[in-house]
Design a protein with these regions (language model features):
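Hydrophobic alpha-helical transmembrane segments of multi-pass inner-membrane transport and secretion
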Residues: 7-34, 43-79, 100-113, 227, ...
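Small-residue-rich transmembrane alpha-helices
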Residues: 20-32, 65-69, 102-131, 143-168, ...
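Short cytosolic juxtamembrane segments of multi-pass membrane proteins
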Residues: 168-182, 564, 655-660
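Aromatic- and glycine-rich beta-strand/loop motifs that create alpha-glucan
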Residues: 1-7
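Short amphipathic alpha-helical coupling elements at transmembrane boundaries
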Residues: 4, 73-83, 173-177, 243-250, ...
Length: 660
């Protein structure tokens, strides 16, 4: 039976083998990461294991989905067996051996392929994260065992489903099952309207998110609404559209349109679910591909934005919240405002190690974890407003850093935000400030704690005294003085010297410079960046392969199913006078009408979601929307080419079936 149905079973077995190989490779790579004891292995292991468990979930769904196509094609065959004298228990026995053989072939081929490629994939992971590696052949038997166990469970449920679906039907129903769906579906206006409403609501959620926190909270509800809307519109909306086309006599009463439209109306109920699935999976591929490529390609820019100099020191100055006069009165140089002990320690350490500091950046910063509501920010706990990270800078630092020449009166402020809608006058913990001007662009990546999934707002105030007053006001609202806010002094600088001298400076800085709460050395942080974003790209590749496999399989089986359904119908059309050329043109037109609709909808989905995705990417320190846009467009083009290739191959198979 499997040989006779090779056109159906071969792609199924290939997909099962590919997914078994993916599971084995992911499992074995996670084992190799642990055994290697490499630096940053915890992050890589966690991401690979998360990817492994998510892949298990999708493998179950994909196998059940494709198995349903196969069973639909074979139910008529099983009905014939029953009429010829086979009992249900005999059919169950046949199904058992077919499922067992499928599982055995898939495991043998998948694990064998996984063993061959697992070490190469491990080296690819090391390449992505910037670590050296060498090719060593090994087989983690733990990975073999877990892959076998997963497939045993999965195929057990597939077998139970197949046996139940066959045993519940009588022979007549089995013979008739492959023809199900030929009755013209009714126009379900309510479902079409509900789908349009759900899709519209999902789009509105995506387009009205102004901050990273809103984007994270709205993302999954928006995804659910878009999925519901997509399925409803493909199933109910498409039928309504086709029937509207049928009423257009000028369009409908042409041979190619007549056959295509009438044929699609009769089968759209079963066809629409597959098209909607293709659309959702295509969107998943585009989102995953564009996001992973953007994060990986932009990791060096993100590193330099977040850590603008080689040495980045954050010094906490609690006394400034008590006494604004602790700053010296000299205003001639930038260094006059730097706490003397920190500045002296940097100079002393530079001299003792033989290094020179250069390209320094120095500025005060006050950070307040606040709630926002109606132009008011407060640090009080239990406030019902939206979460916001509030940064305060003084005007002198802002003008110096950005080459500006703003002037502010007392009670005025410049304002920048990633989404918080503040207009007119702002209330910060009881202190009133009039917004003199909104800043359109601000490099928030240089601020301590910027990579948070909440709204980010920056107030530039006239002087340090304003920052001290705001720090006191914010702390006064915090009960029991828990987690008080302090003013920080950021000291960023590059360092020049021999390799040994620079290493000595970096090693001694944390212990010899007073007041340091955090110190980041860019060359050391770079390894952590590469480990994180390289691992994200690695697991993204597996998700892309998985989603592409599911997409191609659904397309392939949809074309085969439609081909068999259309074969008799087009045979009749040839008998009543249509030429082979007209039949082929009609087939091509029909396939084009439905084939590229999911791709078009997927492009619309990702275009609408792009602003929300940009906000979500800031959680990963990705603030370069232009780079993300470039990779999104590139992903659409690459996927479009792959989609076109699949179309050409499956259209050829479809035509062969119809013409046979």
């Amino acid at each position: 039976n499997m040989k006779k149905n090779s056109s159906i079973y071969f792609p199924y077995l290939f997909a099962c083998s590919l997914m078994a190989g993916l599971l084995y490779v992911l499992n074995s790579v996670s084992v190799m990461v642990v055994d290697s004891g490499m630096k940053g292995g915890d992050i890589m292991y966690m991401l690979v294991r998360i990817c492994f468990f998510i892949c298990i979930f999708f493998v179950f769904i994909i196998l059940f989905y494709i198995n349903s196509f196969i069973m639909k094609r074979r139910k008529r065959e099983f009905g014939l067996f029953c009429i010829l004298g086979m009992e249900k228990k005999h059919l169950a026995f046949v199904l058992f051996w077919e499922v067992f053989r499928s599982m055995l072939i898939s495991l043998l081929a998948g694990i064998a392929g996984g063993i061959l490629f697992s070490q190469l994939m491990f080296l690819l992971l090391l390449k992505f994260v910037g670590l050296p590696g060498k090719l060593v052949f090994r087989i983690p038997f733990q990975s073999v065992g877990e892959t076998i166990l997963i497939y045993l469970i999965c195929f057990f449920f597939v077998l139970i489903y197949d046996i139940i679906s066959v045993s519940r039907a009588n022979p007549t129903e089995l013979l008739r099952s492959s023809k199900e769906g030929e009755r013209e579906p009714k126009t379900r206006w309510l479902a079409a309207a509900a789908g349009a409403a759900a899709l519209g609501a999902g789009y509105v959620k995506a387009l009205t998110t102004y901050t990273a926190s809103d984007a994270l909270l709205a993302f999954f509800p928006a995804v659910v609404l878009v999925i519901i809307g997509t399925y409803c519109l493909f199933q109910a909306g498409s039928i309504a559209l086709l029937k509207a086309l049928r009423k257009n006599k000028a369009f409908y009463y042409k041979p190619e349109n007549f056959v295509s439209v009438s044929g699609m109306i009769y089968r759209m109920k079963q066809n629409a679910a597959g098209l909607a699935s293709i659309c959702i999976l295509s969107t998943a591929v585009l989102v995953t591909l564009s996001s992973c490529l953007s994060l990986y390609a932009g990791e060096e820019d993100m590193l330099r934005n977040q850590f603008p100099r080689e040495i980045n020191i954050y010094s906490q100055i609690p006394e400034l919240t008590e006494n604004a006069d602790s700053r010296t009165e000299e205003q001639g140089t930038v260094t006059s405002g730097l706490p003397a002990a920190v500045h002296e320690a940097i100079d002393t350490l530079s001299a003792s190690t033989g290094c020179e500091t250069e390209n320094s950046m120095e500025f005060y910063q006050l950070s307040l974890a606040a709630s926002y509501e109606n132009n008011s920010f407060t640090t009080a706990l239990g406030n019902k407003g939206s979460s916001s990270m509030l940064y305060i800078m003084e005007l002198a630092d802002y003008n110096r850093l950005y080459g500006k020449s703003y002037e502010l009166e007392a009670g005025e402020a410049l304002f920048f935000t990633t989404g918080t809608p503040v207009e007119g006058e702002a209330d910060i913990c009881g202190e009133k400030y009039r917004i003199r001007e909104r800043i359109d662009k601000f490099d928030i990546t240089q601020l301590l704690g910027f990579a948070t999934p909440v709204d980010l707002s920056v107030f530039v105030v006239p002087g340090l005294e304003d920052m001290v007053r705001l720090a006191k006001a914010g702390n006064a609202l915090i009960p029991d003085k828990r987690f008080p806010s302090y003013i920080y002094y950021h000291t960023f600088f590059d360092i020049d010297g021999s390799k040994e001298a620079v290493a000595a400076f970096e090693d001694r800085a944390a212990g010899e410079i007073p007041g340091i709460t955090r110190i980041y050395v860019r060359s050391q942080v770079r390894a952590e960046f590469y480990e994180l974003y390289g691992s994200i790209l690695f697991v993204g590749i597996f998700f892309i392969i998985l989603f592409l496999t599911a997409t191609v399989l659904i397309i392939y089986y949809k074309q085969i199913t439609e081909g068999y359904d259309d074969r008799e119908r087009f045979g009749i059309m040839e008998k009543v006078g249509m030429s082979a050329k007209e039949v082929k043109r009609t087939i091509t037109r029909q396939v084009l009408m439905v084939f590229f609709l999911p791709l078009g909808m997927a492009v619309i989905h990702i275009a609408v979601a792009f602003p929300q995705l940009c906000k979500m990417m800031t959680v990963f320190s990705m603030t370069n929307a232009g780079l993300f846009a470039v990779f999104t467009i590139l992903s659409v083009l690459l996927f479009g080419l792959a989609y076109l290739l699949v179309y050409r191959l499956t259209a050829r198979t479809y035509f062969k079936i119809v013409q046979s």
